[in-house]
Amino acid sequence: MAATAHGLCEFIDASPSPFHVCATVAGRLLGAGYRELREADRWPDKPGRYFTVRAGSLVAWNAEQSGHTQVPFRIVGAHTDSPNLRVKQHPDRLVAGWHVVALQPYGGVWLHSWLDRDLGISGRLSVRDGTGVSHRLVLIDDPILRVPQLAIHLAEDRKSLTLDPQRHINAVWGVGERVESFVGYVAQRAGVAAADVLAADLMTHDLTPSALIGASVNGTASLLSAPRLDNQASCYAGMEALLAVDVDSASSGFVPVLAIFDHEEVGSASGHGAQSDLLSSVLERIVLAAGGTREDFLRRLTTSMLASADMAHATHPNYPDRHEPSHPIEVNAGPVLKVHPNLRYATDGRTAAAFALACQRAGVPMQRYEHRADLPCGSTIGPLAAARTGIPTVDVGAAQLAMHSARELMGAHDVAAYSAALQAFLSAELSEA
């Protein structure tokens, strides 16, 4: 199934946490004939389509047609996490008769965008069972939480909004008598005894469904409004690209790989973030399973290439002065190649040419993004993955507005173009003299 705007909406609405992103992708892969491998097991020595999951991260690859130990990798990397409000370990508060859940910001969350929204809960419970500990996904898609804003009549300054993340972003979830704890309530909703919950990784999500909005052209809406476009739009586009390569280009001279990592929004320095050994260890095991050696693996990295797929800033119509004037970026105008002289993005001349060629072969336009020199620039998994693996890397994305808001906006037509470019990158060869 090709990537579509409707498909992205369904993907996002089913995936409110990094754990759910991995579960959604895993479900699609299993349906397409992929087999899940556990890292602790011995991996099969025959070609095939496989994936492995480490907490909120996943790596998938199609080596069905590529048994030779020197076939290079073509990798699409993205991240599964998004800035949000997360539940503290001891969240229960009682303030002026209100039952309050203590929250804290995760990543560079745009705090004010979370006020006065109906919020659900998602994440993972670690539960004691008969054999030890098991992990259960949690999804409560009911409006159980809300972070209420202060009335304008009570504000110290009506012209600006300053939020203290310790005091001002806690959520209410009821009044009056309540015996159970918040985690106990979540456990009950998940069908688990509260006494068996050993740990909880819980986070909030906006309950407004993803939607196609804006003026329609030939019956098709031009814009897509959704939470977590940064960076679930890239996870979805990369997943569909990998599955399309399976159908169209399995005899390619590359092993196509999808690597989606948790914790990008907080620096990637975790046991399953982009700074971990997850990608490099999986790639080495692919080579070893094909009968190769570590020497073969190291040689293979030099001919491989990685596209770090993360969303890009479209030029904002209300704040055009916040953008580089010679590099306007539009929605519905094709994927974005991102370049930064101080390596906030990993793109160099060789990898930029590879992605430009991929866009040409996919028949989609490509835009080039440069950040204003007088503003600090964010980064991606690109420089981190490149440093960890030594694989030449290009940073790319799709254009959007309102990055890190609870609700973001992109071009509906960019979904298919973005995935098509990534598909071409996974399968198209770059000839070099």
From Swiss-Prot:
Q: Which GO terms describe its molecular function?
A: aminopeptidase activity; metallopeptidase activity; zinc ion binding
Q: What protein is this chain from?
A: Probable M18 family aminopeptidase 2
Output the InterPro entries linked to this UniProt entry.
M18_aminopeptidase_2, Peptidase_M18, Peptidase_M18_dom2
As recorded in UniProt, its EC number(s) are 3.4.11.-
Q: Which UniProt keywords apply?
A: Aminopeptidase, Hydrolase, Metal-binding, Metalloprotease, Protease, Zinc
One biological process term from GO is:
proteolysis
Fetch the HAMAP family from UniProt: Aminopeptidase_M18_2 (MF_00467)
Record organism: Mycobacterium tuberculosis (strain ATCC 25618 / H37Rv)
Which family does the similarity line name?
Answer: Belongs to the peptidase M18 family.
